[in-house]
Design a protein with these regions (language model features):
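Glycine-rich, mobile lid/loop segments that gate access to catalytic sites or pores
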Residues: 123-236
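Anion-binding (especially nucleotide phosphate/pyrophosphate-binding) glycine-rich loop
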Residues: 48-129, 137
Length: 279
């Protein structure tokens, strides 16, 4: 097979790492959704790997590090960059385009500046620069406040994040109207002059998975009862604010709420209780 060379940037955002590409740098056939694009990202990350190690790729054998991002200048009014996220399976030939990665969202602004997707003349010499991001997977607006020092993205700092060993600069994120479904993606609020937002520290089909957006409580209930075959019934709150999330009482699952990841993933019974399937 002929060799191709594709520029890419490897970045950490929050507690995740991923490989970032400029859309224009991908081969022409991969600049559109489809099998060619997915195949390139799978190979870049080292998937599918039956050994589960991703030795021959940029993935690092965990869901937190088997991620890909495609960035491009935005043609959408009021936005600087379009951000498309793909969760790359480790052992299967599959890229999930159905949602966003909140962690890597913190790296999109700095990466867009590094990649020249934002005019250099707009970047201040010092201070903070707001990068307006269109999150294409879920159709929402994110504003990343990127620290700038001497005209460059400031990467070092004293911000500490649980799960990350070393301190770094903080990139504050604003998720604009994360629970509302509308064509403006949160760029325009129902309250004039006062956009609704949720703040967070840095730390399918594409490009728009319609099922990922909607009301704050998608079922219309504050509390639902989930029936897990062979496990039992659990009281749960289903919330859709940026990414669909299920909240459960730790004690009902046999936890205290202080367990580390290993204590949960080692238990097959508990993993079955956590796993859900949609029709």
């Amino acid at each position: 097979q002929p060799q191709i060379r594709i520029p890419a940037t490897y970045l950490r955002g929050g507690t995740s790492k991923g490989v970032f590409f400029r859309l224009q740098d991908l081969p022409e056939a991969a600049q559109q959704p489809g099998a060619v694009r997915d195949a390139i990202l799978l190979r870049a990350l080292g998937s599918p790997d039956p050994y589960g190690k991703q030795i021959d790729g940029m993935g690092n054998a965990s869901s937190s590090t088997s991620k890909a991002v495609i960035l491009s200048r935005s043609t959408r009014p009021g936005h600087d960059v379009d951000y498309l996220f793909g969760q790359v399976s480790i052992d299967q030939p599959f890229v999930d385009w159905s949602g966003n990665c909140g962690n890597l969202s913190a790296a999109v602004g700095p990466c867009a500046i590094h990649m020249g997707l934002i005019d250099a003349a707009r970047i201040p010499q010092n201070g903070t620069f707001p990068v307006r991001i269109w999150q294409a997977n879920i159709g929402k607006t994110i504003v990343a406040h990127v620290p700038i020092s001497n005209g460059q993205v400031q990467e070092t700092g004293d911000f500490e994040l649980d799960g990350v060993t070393f301190a770094a600069a903080e990139v504050a994120l604003e998720f604009m109207d994360p629970a509302e479904d509308g064509d403006d993606g949160g760029a325009i609020s129902t309250a004039p002059g006062r956009p609704k937002l949720a703040r967070a520290p840095s730390g399918g089909s594409e490009p728009h998975a319609v099922g990922s957006v909607g009301a704050l409580f998608p079922t219309g209930n504050v509390v639902d009862t989930l029936e897990v075959p062979g496990v039992g019934s659990f009281a749960a709150t289903l919330i859709n604010a940026g990414i669909p999330t299920i909240f459960l009482n730790a004690q009902e699952l046999g936890y205290t709420g202080t367990e580390l990841q290993g204590a949960i993933t080692v238990s097959y019974t508990h993993l079955r209780a956590h796993e859900t399937r949609g029709n």
